[in-house]
Amino acid sequence: MPCLARLLDLADVSDSSSKANGSNPIGADRSAQLPAAWDPAAVEENLYQGWVDSGYFKADPSSDKPPFSIVLPPPNVTGQLHMGHALDHTLMDAMARRKRMQGFEVLWLPGSDHAGIATQTKVEANLKETEGKDRFDYGRDAFVGKVWEWKDRYGGVIQRQMRAIGDSVDWSRERFTLDDGLSRAVQTMFKELFDAGLIYRANRMVNWSPVLQTAISDIEVVYSDDEGELVSIRYGSLEDSEPHVVVATTRVETMLGDVAVAVHPEDERYTDLVGKSLPHPFLPDRQMIVVADDYVDPEFGTGAVKITPAHDPNDFAMGQRHDLPMPVIMDETGHIANTGTEFDGMERYEAREKIRLALEEQGRIVARKFPYVHSVGHSERSKEAVEPRLSEQWFVKVEELAKMSGDAIRSGDSVIHPSSQEPRWFDWVDDMHDWCISRQLWWGHRIPIWYGPNGEIVCCGPDDEAPTGEGWYQDEDVLDTWFSSALWPFSTMGWPEKTPELEKFYPTSVLVTGYDILFFWVARMMMFATFASKHTPEILGTGKDGRPQIPFNDIFLHGLVRDEHGRKMSKSLGNGIDPMDWVRDYGADALRFTLARGANPGSDLPVGEDAAQSSRNFATKLYNATKFALMNGARVGELPARETLTDADRWILDRLEEVRQLVDDALDRYEFSLANENLYRFAWGEFCDWYLEIAKVQIPRDWDSATEEQVQRGIRTQIVLGRVLDSVLRLLHPAMPFVTETLWKALTDGEEGYSESLVTADWPTADLTNGGAQTDADAVRRMADVDKLVTELRRFRSDQGVKPSQKVPAKLDFAAADLANFEEAVRSLVRLETPEEDFAETASIEVRLSQATIAVQLDTSGTVDVAAERKRLEKDLAAAQKELDNAAKKLGNENFLAKAPEKVVEGIRERQRVAQEEFERITARLEGLPKA
């Protein structure tokens, strides 16, 4: 047919073997490149390795492209990916992939943390189990060697998991907090701080782990409500007429360290006692002075509190205010020591019981309350109750550093997203206590301090020669893991050396992490970065208006991943989810899209199996839709003249551009949920469910018998299909890299001007979506009318008991509603046949549209089995009634309403509303059925 030959020329078809024999005139069927079904496990590993081998993820500091850089929050070297990591990595990877597509030179720098306590504890436990030895049996050097062996053997797990979920990091730049370069940076920073007078050694209160025998940080202390006993002890005379006070404690054993009793200065009950002394029950040489202090709450208990300055942080503060002695009554293992009493050598819990019994014998136990539930801090690693304990440790003086950190946010040099987290930042940095940086461990950065035989203290930098000779020795402690982590943004790029990486990529563009470590990690990075900038401006540069350089321009704080009921994931609840299980069961894209679709700045993210299945189904939907489009000739190419396109063509292109703009705006604000939810709704609800269905009508089923106009329309539809698919796959690539890469390669394979991979393809702009055209309001209106008409007719068919596959003769006036061009599409979408002469109306419906109310008459005779329909409806009615009963039962339970999360209650109310509507609809339908 001549007209087809001319159109093939217009379509620029290079496949000369393609013939107009009823086949697709565009050329070979590209869908043949795709297997019958989407199987992520079959392609993900090879796709990822191909990206790595092609060097797509490598950063070039000599590039002229604008820089975009992120440093990966370093996971524990022997750790495994948990859902919090998976969220972190998904969001960072989405940012990195999008920025590459936007033409940035991207550095996403990976690495891992030596994780002092976590790693040492794990290795010690393994050695105890396998060899029956502890670290002291080996000695320091041999034990550290064992830890390195463990790290080398088990340290690659999380890296393999990162590859499995698609992290586009530059593996050639992977760092470790104990590698030579970072060790040099740590020693340099310690020396700089020490020389500036910001590092000092002192006796201070710390969280002490008797099992680990080290101080631990606040973040490594987990609080839980424990059952204990509240014991009231009488100090002073046993005669009521003589001076005495009653104090209460849950830690009876600490009374061996009591040096005073505190009361409120305005508490008249104790006015005469203030300044007097009370004898200690077990230590006759110790007199406990009664002091007045505003800390005491006169309304709580007896209004008097015991003061144990060396074993309670609040008591320590009072001890400093009143210049009290601070005897430490417990050794590193949690045993009573150096009290000169019969209790020395007892483990703390044994001593608690023995001391209580001894006090009872003296008649000093006034009351016992058991069980008494109170909050107790436990070591996250060793699980035992932490002991507040006065200990000589190394500290960083934070006042100056904290001020610079606060100023960095106040000035806008670094911006926190969401801004609602700013008050928490200022609460911490404006009221920060000096930071204990020493740990009594062997695995880590050893403190670079040497002590001489005559009391000398020497701090050595990496290029200094450590003092040697008789009597000289290095400090035994190591630095808190957070010390080296605080240097991460710039030490990983070569500081303290001046490097091309620092010049190109520092400060980093954005830090992505959870709000729960805003203080523990983020604030400390800000402190060290601003300090380093101030002292080495020639390396790190200077910030705006001469202020210290910040380590990251933006701080994006996401929430915690919770279970589908909003509960924190924990071993005790058994509600934890291993992200690698989802990768195995649903594919990496399903995991990533579930997390990206739910992630908003600062908000917690509830996830469950249903969400993962939904994301898996979305990937499958994309796959099947692309395969169908390719089978029908979808291809990339120049858009035809806009006036030649159908309303549906213009509508889908304009909607694509609207969604593109929304996605760009949302991602620029780190609103991943908004961006991906809109992509999901557009791709599934508008492109797959609507435009693809209309495209089936616009593309000829038999090209041989098609008119010239139908062939032209079909070819234009194929190009629009290709254009929309091209853009949708690009927009979804940051969140779903594997399925989009697979489909995009099938769509663009061999096309001139297209890159080999989506990783390096251009990010969509208006030119790529709808050619930069203005939205066609008439097309939008008509498509909205088609949407409403089809939806109402489908619902009406269902209400009439017509099976979805059953074609029904129908009369309706499309011209009156300005939908004449959509008659074929609507009839196809609703399965309506053109009526014959013997048409007999059995049902009708009126649908109000924008231009007119359209009347539709249907002939359903012979299409409905009344008895079967009645049985089906009665079954559905019973199901709706059951749902209503269940909802009413739950919503009528006051105990349930008080405990259930608001989202759960809202979900039940919504199901109740839907069930009520369903009940009423089915009832009406049953009443309308012909009587038997």
Swiss-Prot record:
EC number, UniProt record: 6.1.1.9
Keyword Glycoprotein belongs to the record: no
Secretion signal, residue range per the UniProt entry: none
Subcellular compartments: Cytoplasm
Keyword entries, A-Z: Aminoacyl-tRNA synthetase, ATP-binding, Coiled coil, Cytoplasm, Ligase, Nucleotide-binding, Protein biosynthesis
Motif ('KMSKS' region): 568-572
UniProt cross-references to PROSITE patterns, sorted A to Z: AA_TRNA_LIGASE_I
Superkingdom of source: Bacteria
Job description of the protein: Catalyzes the attachment of valine to tRNA(Val). As ValRS can inadvertently accommodate and process structurally similar amino acids such as threonine, to avoid such errors, it has a 'posttransfer' editing activity that hydrolyzes mischarged Thr-tRNA(Val) in a tRNA-dependent manner.
Domain free text: ValRS has two distinct active sites: one for aminoacylation and one for editing. The misactivated threonine is translocated from the active site to the editing site. The C-terminal coiled-coil domain is crucial for aminoacylation activity.
Family membership: Belongs to the class-I aminoacyl-tRNA synthetase family. ValS type 1 subfamily.
SUBUNIT field: Monomer.
Protein name: Valine--tRNA ligase
